[in-house]
Amino acid sequence: MNVYYEQDADLKHLQGKNIAVLGYGSQGHAHALNLKESGLNVCVGLRTDSSSCAKARQAGLEVNTIADAVKWADIIMILLPDQYQKAIYETEIAPNLETGNTLAFAHGFNIHYKQIVPPETVNVIMIAPKSPGHLVRRTFTEGNGVPCLIAVHQDYTGNAKEQALAWAKGLGGAKAGVIETTIKDETETDLFGEQAVLCGGSAELIKAGFETLVEAGYPEELAYFECLHELKLIVDLYYEGGLSRMNYSVSDTAEYGGMTRGPRLITPAVKAEMKKILEEVQDGRFAKEFIDECNSGYKNLTSLRESNTNHPIEKVGAKLRNMMSWLIKK
């Protein structure tokens, strides 16, 4: 696996180019502002009725409609939600592409699952910061950066990789390290991680732990602190130094209990289910399910959101967080 740093990337591959960032959400604002402050020529493409137009202009960015931004640009970064990209690509992006343009993405979903099939006469690249947009922005303003993944899906001009590296450098990512991968690997590992560990597995583990304590007669407040609130302290240790750092930092009692009881929870049956989840990502079943869900008006997702919001851990959590002055503003 190739890893690149600042000396391996050169902004000259973007200098003199017109760069359009489509979208101004978490990632969009970070990409647009970081590249602009890296000395590049950037505009933001948004719907005319978007509430983000005023925010982008207030930040000193030029704002155009999506279609006009694409017409103007040499390099187009699509940072719109996955489920909207296909329709906007077909109606506002594809008709305005020119030979030699570069299409860029921060996640490979629509390319990998062929929701978007660009013409062969354009570059297709990915630059994926491994961090939420607000951290991409904050670390840049502090003179640092977050690690990025890059991938080249199509190289029409012969310098697509150089453009991707330059973009990562403009974001600040080359200070932390830029890892070269493929659209396929980024998409499949990203989706699996979200579903099995980060957003799915961890949330269900938290709820199950909370429910177990409450059903055994313990106060909801104690269950919340033990199963959700303190998780941040543990995750911070993982983040800073891996599993070993966590084990070193906790008590011997906690370390022994975790090492002997953890495997009783994450059994071979759980790992087998993880493999099934990965297979659904790999063969496109999850992508089809999600696209069908979007087309149905999010009926299942709406119900799941409501159920999650009404879970007792959310009610007691809101009450307890109101006691934590450092969290109120967030």
Curated annotation (Swiss-Prot):
Cofactors demanded by this protein: Mg(2+)
Gene Ontology cellular-component terms listed: cytosol
Organism annotation: Prosthecochloris aestuarii (strain DSM 271 / SK 413)
Superkingdom: Bacteria
Residues that hold NADP(+) according to the record: 24-27, 47, 50, 52, 82-85, 133
Official protein name in the record: Ketol-acid reductoisomerase (NADP(+))
Domain KARI N-terminal Rossmann, residue spans: 1-181
Catalytically driven reaction(s): (2R)-2,3-dihydroxy-3-methylbutanoate + NADP(+) = (2S)-2-acetolactate + NADPH + H(+); (2R,3R)-2,3-dihydroxy-3-methylpentanoate + NADP(+) = (S)-2-ethyl-2-hydroxy-3-oxobutanoate + NADPH + H(+)
Gene Ontology molecular function: any one: NADP binding
Gene: ilvC
